[in-house]
């Protein structure tokens, strides 16, 4: 928590907050799409070997083609703006998640699969209730890769309308302003560290929540519940008392 606070404090103190929030907004859209797409693609590759053989060269191509090469077709299809930048980011960040998912599911212990068959789990239950939870630690490596690659794409995506910190770095490079470019670059690093720590903390909390599933949701997530209660309370106070609206 202190490290995450220090990262965001660094961004605020150096005046990069607005650009960082623009970058964070695009990353928070691209990362879930990349994770979900990679997870589903990896599960399909694990289930169907023929699909995996056909998918392998596609993933190789997505990972080896320079990012600049597919900016032009993305611009033609989606135009100049944040949408094109998010699409380019997803294309760049999805392949590692797909590969890690397929590999992680194969590495689940045979005893775990046998246990799922013994209790009569269907194919869907075997995948989502047995294999995926058992491979959570390995899958988190894929999640980390998606986050890091999404932030790695920030500067390149700024060329097609992403804005945010990537645009600040690009503008500083055009002006040869080393100081401004270094500040924006370090802000990207701080954002990456904060998101990585938050994702790891979320995974650990979910693992502990599985062991304490019998308790209520507010008891399992007291800080989130308190935050939501505070937001609702301040919103209601703003409706009742005009002084709270400002």
Q: Each predicted region: which residue ranges?
A:
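N-terminal, non-cleaved signal-anchor transmembrane helix
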Residues: 1-25, 32, 200-246
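Short cytoplasmic-facing helical segments at TM-TM junctions of multi-pass membrane proteins
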Residues: 97-142
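Membrane-embedded alpha-helices of multi-pass transport/permease systems
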Residues: 37-41, 48, 52-55, 69, ...
